[in-house]
């Protein structure tokens, strides 16, 4: 069904297929209520189609929290549909009628708790093993399918007619494992289930814990902590150790099985599959043990109901002649206890044992409206019958009740079908024989019509019988207890709702705070991203500006380079033209000169003249060509040189520009990083403040919810105390009514053999007048009896109920507890009466209230005076209590000792198989343990210690004369020290064995394996033994051992006068200078250890070579003003200025001086090299004395104060450039010197 659907809606096909469409009232007949629980009621019914007997569980889903109830019903139906195992209850179907779900299952005779109810004794161990084996098989089936029962207890372990053990009541079960909900019955809950809401999930091992508690319940008739409030039991289960079997009569297999089931850590607890292989459940046992137990229980139930029937008939027929007078209500009240005594539990709250008091949502939600919605027609019929009975008189009403019980008795062996035509109740052959007693008249004078009508109504109600192991009084008592315990279930459900509400409130608060944190982080992230985006935009803008500057500078440099080259080329052209012009003029002049020379010599032939002139011209042209070529070569070299120089200047200028731009970029980035860091720090502070506020809000909410929870728990505890007081009043009033009238007459008589009561001590105050002689009216007598038997025992009952919880309450809470109880706490004068009245209870209660069994917390707080002062047990009270308990019985103000046989007869003890001490029951032949006497501890004798010290000193003196006996002294010293430490003879023998084994193993290792000489091994053994003896004697404070050794060695050497004097002087020096030497050695040792590897240091530290005292001495700042840090911080070492310098300190000073001189020499050589000529620098570099310094590529950042965020400063134009071609000038930079 979807979460938002209506309860009872079948629109969802998956939900609709879970329920049958038929009308259950037409399919099932003879519905009779056979049990009650927190879920509602269980009815016996018969299927009209095949006459099969079934059990119907009616669960209402109307009223408050109807959706939750509907979901729980769907969950249980789905769970039951999946079960297919002989050890689980069989599912027959589920029907819907008038907002009530009819869950039909197979019918079982009863539960394991019914066995305890009927027999009033624990089960035998073989019976517990059989029941546990069947339950384990069912749990193993559930756990193998990832299912958890979560409510395993004796009340949910059912027994069928064939003797099968079946698991029932799956209202708290979980289909998915692991689970994390707080579900189950408090006393059977596992610790992980109790802590599931706070700590995490659990699995099927919680059923193993519940099974262990169920074993204790079957062995002791009640689970552990059963006398405690349910809420208090939850805290004890979660915090205390696991419970164990109290009696010592059980076998070791059973004890081991229970201990295995009750392992506190779930990982150590075995699974159900593993427990099926345990010897406790696999031991041989009779195959019919369950059948025999069922048959014996049926016989006991028959005897109980027959006894109840005889008592009721005797009372009714004896009082019948008096008519419906004033004595009838009184007799009804006297008959009422018999109805309850037949099936009364000895525990304080029987409602926890029989009905399923689950804390699941289904059980809580269906516990209130189950009766009203399930049996409207039956209630109308019962009202009509009650009106008729009121008209007919009390005799007819009691007779109808009696015959109802009779009909229930007669049908325990088989299912009987009676003919509808028979209208006589005694025509049934299975009715018990009722022999008339001598006191019974042959015919009752009551009207015949009244008796016959009552019989007819009883027959109509019980015309068909059914097999069961539950008495009629038990069923009626369960109905009454269900009505009484509805407040408790509502209290538990309210507590669970409060826990759920608190958890939802915390989850809502955490989700809201998580949303605030996410919103805060998103806002901070947006702010950071916006700032980073702004920084990115600024960086891109700066990069574009730098790129524009670089491109502009590059274009300008290229233009200037082209102009520079054109200028040089123009000059070179002019030089070449001038050269060519000069060559022409020179050629003409030379040509004229040659012609003149030829004319001066006319004898030369003309041809020769022409040839000579031609040669001269060629030579001249060749010279001119060479000169022109040389000029061109020089011009080219000059052009290349000038170009290289100009490019170098331009590159240096570009490099300086790039450095300026890069410096500006880095400064900008550093500024942005500083701003981002400041923003992150501010955001971190804001986030930390927000988290601190949220943590404070969460802590305040948790504290408020915890306070509300504690207030609710305290209110529940006070309400529980009030309810227990009311129950105790009713119980004591019933006990007073059950006592013979002779006891009331002898109430003031003193039993023989008791001393007179001491005024102001235990017991009621003595006024000097006998109780018989004191005038009192019948009403005052009843009030006196109620006060003596009711109010005085309420305080003891409250003290027993509270237990350790009451002892651990604060005085303010105890004062509130006393005020809320409605009656003032008893004064110290009433302690005797408290104990007296409590002794006259049941045997289990008497054993629990023995004074020696009280813990100091329970014994210290007894009551509270009206003025608010607390009274404590005194020594006089304890002595009086001890004296009274030693007598075997105590004085009671209104009761006398009743024999145990009479009590059993009045209580209607069942006739069954007797129990023996082997079953876990206390033997009646064993007398009760006397209270322990408080003896003053006597002082321990010092003689054994003196003897051991003297023996060790003597052995040391004897061994000192011969060093070869040192290993023997060690072997003797080890067992003596072990025995002296409290181990006894066993420890001494173990120490001697260890010493011998160690000596033998060392001999085998050293002499046999390593071939060590025997003399060397003996010397090594003597040294080791000497060190061990001295160490052991020093550790155990046996100073006689080293003194004996030293004395023996001194006496063995006669000439020891001078050595003794030297030793005395050395001892004086050691006493004076010893601490300083020890500190120095310790510091040196620690410094050596600290230079080791971490693994070696850790190993030595584990061996004890490093101590905290030495570390604190080495690092004094870690132990400043009493504060010891875990991180050693080296502090300044305080030195005495008068002491001489350490040699290492002098070497360090020399090293510092050498480094200073080296640095000065390097600076001087660098300055000298800057002033040397180039050839000298090249010569020294070729020799290897100098080397060139490479300029770094990392720009030098300016300090924060000198940073300029604006554009770089204007630069002067480079030398050699035109001044008028740029609008801004640029400063020239000097070239760095050559290194």
Swiss-Prot record:
Residue stretches of biased makeup (Polar residues): 766-777
Enzyme Commission designation: 2.7.11.1
Biased composition (Acidic residues): 375-393, 899-908
Membrane topology: Multi-pass membrane protein
One Pfam family from the record: Pkinase
Pro residues biased stretches: 924-934
GO-annotated molecular function: ATP binding; MAP kinase kinase kinase activity; mitogen-activated protein kinase kinase binding; neuropilin binding; protein serine kinase activity; protein serine/threonine kinase activator activity; protein serine/threonine kinase activity; tau protein binding
GO biological process assignments: actin cytoskeleton organization; apoptotic process; axonogenesis; basal dendrite arborization; basal dendrite morphogenesis; cell migration; DNA damage response; focal adhesion assembly
Effect after changing residue 169 to A: Loss of kinase activity; No effect on MAP3K7-mediated activation of NF-kappa-B
Compartment list: Cytoplasmic vesicle membrane; Cytoplasm, Cytoskeleton; Nucleus
Biased composition (Low complexity): 350-374
Signal peptide positions (record): none
Compositional bias of kind Basic and acidic residues: 394-409
Swiss-Prot/TrEMBL cofactor(s): Mg(2+)
Keyword Cytoplasm: yes
Active site: 151 (proton acceptor)
Top-level lineage group: Eukaryota
UniProt keyword annotations, A-Z: ATP-binding, Cell projection, Coiled coil, Cytoplasm, Cytoplasmic vesicle, Cytoskeleton, Kinase, Magnesium, Membrane, Nucleotide-binding, Nucleus, Phosphoprotein, Serine/threonine-protein kinase, Transferase, Transmembrane, Transmembrane helix
InterPro entries: Kinase-like_dom_sf, Prot_kinase_dom, Protein_kinase_ATP_BS, Ser/Thr_kinase_AS, TAO_STE20_kinase
Sequence similarity: Belongs to the protein kinase superfamily. STE Ser/Thr protein kinase family. STE20 subfamily.
UniProt function note: Serine/threonine-protein kinase involved in different processes such as membrane blebbing and apoptotic bodies formation DNA damage response and MAPK14/p38 MAPK stress-activated MAPK cascade. Phosphorylates itself, MBP, activated MAPK8, MAP2K3, MAP2K6 and tubulins. Activates the MAPK14/p38 MAPK signaling pathway through the specific activation and phosphorylation of the upstream MAP2K3 and MAP2K6 kinases.
Self-association state and partner proteins as the record states: Interacts with MAP2K3 and MAP2K6. Self-associates. Interacts with tubulins through the C-terminal domain. Interacts with MAP3K7 and interferes with MAP3K7-binding to CHUK and thus prevents NF-kappa-B activation. Isoform 2 interacts with PCDH8; this complex may also include CDH2.
Protein's UniProt name: Serine/threonine-protein kinase TAO2
Encoding gene per record: TAOK2
């Amino acid at each position: 069904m979807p979460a938002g659907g209506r309860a009872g809606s079948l629109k969802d096909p998956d939900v609709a297929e879970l329920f049958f469409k038929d009308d259950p009232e037409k399919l099932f007949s003879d519905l009779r209520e056979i049990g009650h629980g927190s879920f509602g009621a269980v009815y016996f019914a018969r299927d009209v189609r095949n006459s099969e007997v079934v059990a119907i569980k009616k669960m209402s889903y109307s009223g408050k929290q109807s959706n939750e109830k509907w979901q729980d019903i769907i969950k249980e139906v789905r769970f039951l549909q999946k079960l297919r195992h002989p050890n689980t209850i069989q599912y027959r179907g589920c029907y819907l009628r008038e907002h009530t779900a009819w869950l039909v299952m197979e019918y079982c005779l009863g539960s394991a708790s019914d066995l305890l109810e009927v027999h009033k004794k624990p089960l035998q161990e073989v019976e517990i093993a059989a029941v546990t084996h069947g339950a384990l098989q069912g749990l193993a089936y559930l756990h193998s399918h990832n299912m958890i029962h979560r409510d395993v207890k004796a009340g949910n372990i059912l027994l069928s007619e064939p003797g099968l053990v079946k698991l029932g009541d799956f209202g708290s079960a979980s289909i998915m494992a692991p689970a994390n909900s707080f579900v189950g019955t408090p006393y059977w809950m596992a610790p992980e289930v109790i802590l599931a809401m706070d700590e995490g999930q659990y699995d099927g091992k919680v059923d193993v814990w519940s099974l262990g508690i169920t074993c204790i319940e079957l062995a002791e008739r009640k689970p552990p902590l059963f006398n405690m409030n349910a809420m208090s039991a939850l805290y004890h289960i979660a915090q205390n150790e696991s419970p164990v079997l109290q009696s010592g009569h059980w076998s070791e297999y059973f004890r081991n099985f229970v201990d295995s089931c009750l392992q506190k850590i779930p990982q150590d607890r075995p699974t159900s599959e593993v427990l099926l292989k345990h010897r406790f459940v696999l031991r041989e046992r009779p195959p019919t043990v369950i059948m025999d137990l069922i048959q014996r229980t049926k016989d006991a139930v028959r005897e109980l109901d027959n006894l109840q029937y005889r008592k009721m008939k005797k009372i009714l027929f004896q009082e019948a002649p008096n008519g419906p007078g004033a004595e009838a209500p009184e007799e009804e009240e006297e008959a009422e206890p018999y109805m309850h005594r037949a099936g009364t539990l000895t525990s304080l709250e029987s409602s926890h044992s029989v009905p399923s008091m689950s804390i699941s949502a289904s059980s809580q939600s269906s516990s209130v409206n189950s009766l009203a919605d399930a049996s409207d027609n039956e209630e109308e019929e019962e009202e009509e019958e009650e009106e008729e009975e009121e008209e007919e008189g009390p005799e007819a009403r009691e007779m109808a009740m009696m015959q109802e019980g009779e009909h229930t008795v007669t049908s325990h062996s088989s299912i009987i079908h009676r003919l509808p035509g028979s209208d006589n109740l005694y025509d049934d052959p299975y009715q018990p024989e009722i022999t008339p007693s001598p006191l019974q008249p042959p015919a009752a004078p009551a009207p015949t019509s009244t008796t016959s009508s009552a019989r007819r109504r009883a027959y109509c109600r019980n015309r068909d019988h059914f097999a069961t192991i539950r008495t009629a009084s038990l069923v009626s008592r369960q109905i009454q207890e269900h009505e009484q315990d509805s407040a408790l279930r509502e209290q538990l459900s309210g507590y669970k709702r409060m826990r759920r509400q608190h958890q939802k409130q915390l989850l809502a608060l955490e989700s809201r705070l998580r949303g605030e944190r996410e919103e805060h982080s998103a806002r901070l992230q947006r702010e950071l991203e916006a700032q980073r985006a702004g920084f990115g935009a600024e960086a891109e803008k700066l990069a574009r500006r730098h790129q524009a500057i670089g491109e502009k500078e590059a274009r300008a440099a290229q233009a200037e380079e082209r102009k520079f080259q054109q200028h040089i080329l123009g000059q070179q052209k002019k030089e070449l033209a001038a050269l060519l012009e000069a060559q022409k003029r020179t050629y003409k002049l030379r040509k004229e000169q040659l012609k003149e020379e030829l004319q001066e010599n006319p004898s030369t032939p003309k041809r020769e003249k022409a040839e000579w002139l031609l040669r001269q011209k060629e030579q001249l042209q060749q010279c001119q060509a060479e000169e022109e070529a040389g000029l061109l070569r020089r011009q080219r070299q000059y052009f290349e040189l000038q170009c290289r120089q100009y490019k170098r200047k331009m590159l240096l200028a570009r490099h300086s520009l790039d450095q300026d731009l890069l410096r500006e970029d880095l400064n900008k980035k550093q500024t942005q990083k500083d701003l981002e860091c400041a923003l992150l720090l501010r955001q971190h502070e804001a986030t930390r403040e927000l988290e601190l506020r949220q943590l404070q809000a969460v802590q305040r909410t948790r504290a408020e919810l915890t306070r509300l929870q504690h207030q609710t728990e305290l209110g529940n505890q006070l309400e529980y105390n009030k309810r227990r007081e009311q129950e105790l009043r009713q119980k004591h009033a019933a006990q007073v009514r059950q006592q013979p009238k002779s006891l009331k007459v002898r109430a003031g008589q003193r039993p023989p053999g008791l001393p007179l009561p001491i005024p102001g001590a235990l017991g009621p105050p003595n006024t000097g007048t006998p109780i018989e002689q004191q005038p009192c009216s019948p009403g005052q007598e009843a009030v006196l009896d109620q006060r003596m038997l009711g109010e005085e025992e309420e305080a003891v009952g409250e003290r027993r109920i509270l237990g350790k919880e009451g002892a651990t309450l604060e005085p303010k809470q105890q004062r509130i507890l006393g005020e809320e109880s409605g009656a003032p706490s008893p004064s110290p004068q009433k302690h005797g009466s408290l104990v007296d009245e409590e002794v006259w209870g049941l045997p289990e209660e008497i054993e629990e209230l023995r004074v020696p069994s009280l813990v100091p917390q329970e014994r210290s707080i007894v009551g509270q005076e009206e003025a608010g002062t607390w009274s404590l047990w005194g020594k006089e009270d304890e002595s009086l209590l001890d004296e009274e308990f030693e007598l075997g019985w105590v004085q009671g103000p209104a009761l006398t000792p009743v024999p145990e046989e009479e009590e059993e007869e009045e209580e209607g003890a069942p006739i069954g198989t007797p129990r023996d001490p082997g079953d876990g029951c206390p033997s009646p032949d064993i007398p009760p343990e006397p209270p322990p006497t408080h003896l003053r501890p006597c002082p321990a004798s010092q003689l054994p210690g003196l003897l051991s010290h003297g023996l060790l000193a003597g052995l040391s003196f004897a061994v000192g004369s011969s060093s070869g006996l040192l290993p023997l002294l060690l072997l003797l010293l080890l067992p003596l020290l072990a025995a002296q430490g409290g181990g006894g003879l066993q420890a001494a023998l173990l120490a001697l064995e260890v010493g011998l084994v160690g000596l033998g193993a060392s001999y085998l290792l050293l002499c046999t394996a390593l071939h060590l000489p025997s003399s060397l091994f003996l010397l090594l053994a003597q040294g080791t033994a000497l060190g061990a003896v001295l160490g052991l004697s020093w550790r155990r404070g046996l100073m006689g051992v080293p003194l004996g050794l030293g004395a023996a060695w001194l006496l063995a050497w006669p000439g020891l006068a001078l050595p003794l004097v030297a030793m005395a002087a050395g001892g004086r020096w050691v006493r004076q200078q010893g601490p300083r030497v020890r500190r120095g050695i310790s510091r040196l040792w620690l410094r050596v250890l600290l230079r080791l590897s971490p693994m070696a240091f850790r190993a030595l530290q584990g061996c004890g070579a490093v101590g905290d005292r030495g570390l604190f001495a080495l690092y004094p700042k870690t132990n400043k003003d009493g504060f010891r840090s875990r991180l050693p911080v080296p502090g300044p070492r305080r030195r005495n200025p008068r002491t001489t310098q350490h040699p290492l300190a002098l070497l360090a000073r020399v090293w510092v001086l050498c480094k200073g001189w080296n640095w000065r020499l390097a600076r001087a050589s660098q300055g000298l090299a800057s002033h040397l000529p180039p050839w000298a620098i090249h010569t020294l570099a070729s020799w290897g004395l100098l080397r060139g310094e490479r300029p770094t590529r990392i720009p030098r950042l300016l300090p924060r104060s000198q940073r300029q965020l604006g554009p770089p400063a204007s630069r002067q134009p480079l030398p050699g450039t035109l001044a008028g071609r740029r609008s801004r000038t640029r400063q020239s930079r000097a070239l760095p010197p050559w290194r």
